[in-house]
Each structure stands twice: as C-alpha cells, then as structure tokens.
C-alpha cells in the first residue's frame, strides 16, 4: 500500500517537474515545488470529482482506484514519529461558502483520510477577509515561511470553496557542516561564466549512485533520525542539467535512488541557497491532462449537488533554505537499467559547483516531499 503512494508521487513529481522546468529559449531560472503538497490537494479534489474530471485527475496522479486516499491517510498518521529529529508538518483545510451545501460523504472522507479541517466562511459578503484568513493560516502552519499565498483579487464573491494544503519541513543534517569551513567558491552558471557563492565543506561517508544514461552522479545527505534526506543529482558537465531533465523518467530516478550505496571518504562541497517560488498551476495541470477541472465541463458532483462548480486555479508557493545546520522548506507527483560498479579513488570529490537538481524525500514510505533545480545562485 505504501509502495503505491511512493509510485504515485514519484511519477507525478517527474511529470510535474518536466512542465515547470525552463524550456525553449528560456534556459535560465530555478525550480522548486512540493509534488507531495500538490498531489495531496489534487487527491482531495479527486475525492469529489466524477466522470471525465475524475479520470483526468486520476491519470496525472497515476492511480486508478480510491485507495490513494488510504495511502495518504497512512502516511499522514506516521508524521508524529518523525519528531523530534525533524519537523514535518502537513495541514489540510477546506474553506467553503457558508451558504454552499457540501455532501456529508465528501467532508467525512476529507476529515478521515486527510485530517482536513472544514471551515464555513462568507465569500459572498467579505471575500477579501476570507483571503486574509487563509493567508494567516498558511503562514502559521509554515512557520511564517509562506506568506501571502493568495494575492489580492484571487478570491471574490463568486468563490465557493478553497482547498488548501500546507507543508513545512525543517531538518538538521545528521552530520552538520562547520560554519568555519564555509568559504567563497565558484558556482559555474555556464562554461564561460561563474559566480562567487558561499560554499559549505564536509568530508565523510555518503550514499552515492551513478546513471550513465542521465550522465549524473547522485549523493544523499541524511537528516537527523535517518527518516528523511536530501539527494543531490549532479550532472557531469556545466550544461548537463538540460540533458538530465530531457531524459529523466520515474523508472530511471527510482532505479538511481534504489541503487545508491555507502561510499567512504567523500569530499563534499555544497552551496548555501535559498529559494522561494509562487506558481499558478492551471496551465501546467491542463498541459498534463487535467482540462475539465477548470472549465464548465467540470463534474465535481461528489463535493456538492449544486452545479456550476469548477476550479479557477491551483496556486502553489514553496520555500527552501539550505545552510550548515540543515534544511528548512515549506509549500502551500519497466526500464531495466544497469549501473556501473564504480571504483573510486581514495578520496572522491563531489563538488556541487554547477547547475544541479535536488529532492527531499521521506524513507518510510519513500515519498518525494520537495523537488527542484538550481541554475542560478
């Protein structure tokens, strides 16, 4: 059951990332999101969707049954066990127009499977006050890292309901970087240009893996408690991130993560970084195949018998900071591979001094919580 959630989120993560990455002539820019958070919000919508609307949402979540709600429920029940080593808080809430009749079966499922609170509000009479209330709740859940999720004008008197998922993560490295070892270093933006950044240094034993097809080496940095970790996917060349993005698939990523092994005497250089991104996901999700959800064709009759209910947008905001102590992050998805048996020299250099991809995931079950890439610092 838990393996299914891993597969759902991993496949969704790769599909989503491919839509968010820079494309065409626009090869600059960083990417950061929480596939888990977005998938959870979509899954809550799926619970009330019917007909083609349900089929389209289910397809991008890579599920074909209702068990996905049980999978999320089982994962959320495990969260208390992550403390005190890491802080991982996930909260779900639905804001519903007070005159809008919700089906009892739907609200019961949200409460049971997603531990969601449901709040009746006055969109019709004071939409902006509700917007500020939503923003205040998200800010509280994410320890003030996600502010102003809903911009002025995004909520109006015609709004019937808002589904909100907020996730907050703070993990200390199992072995922290010494601040005194942090020194200026070059981060290569292109083969011709570089930028001086704060580069953290550490020598130790790390899990590593390699995929020749993706031309990438992976290194895992565990957080305290070993229930979560960050994985750095470092392309061979300065311009290799585009190759990685083009050829990345869920099976390849799964095989890479599953084939990592402990390697001794690794000299790691990792830049400190901080990212914050706000994304309107309507166009992204429509490109992935969720089309009816945002139009008059939407069938959300499992939420309410009232007709004319559709989504106006899915708004996602995410934050991550990586420093010597650890990581703080927040946010309001069969190929047979053979991996080379690498014979490394006595000391292996893993210098993250060029564009790279990274993800933060839990281990039990293995779920991608956050995913992103750094092209610019």
Curated annotation (Swiss-Prot):
Keyword Glycosyltransferase: no
Main location: secreted
A Pfam family annotated for this UniProt entry: Serpin
GO CC annotations on file: extracellular space
Glycosylation sites (chain numbering): 11, 226
SMART domains tied to this protein: SERPIN
GO BP annotations, alphabetical order: immune system process
Location(s) in or outside the cell: Secreted
UniProt xrefs under InterPro entries: Serpin_CS, Serpin_dom, Serpin_fam, Serpin_sf, Serpin_sf_1, Serpin_sf_2
Domain of life from the UniProt record: Eukaryota
Keyword Zinc: no
Function: Salivary protein with immunosuppressive properties that can modulate blood feeding of ticks on vertebrate species. Inhibits proliferation of bovine peripheral blood mononuclear cells (PBMCs). Inhibits IFN-gamma (IFNG) production by bovine PBMCs.
Protein's recorded name: Ipis-1
Gene name of the record: Ipis-1
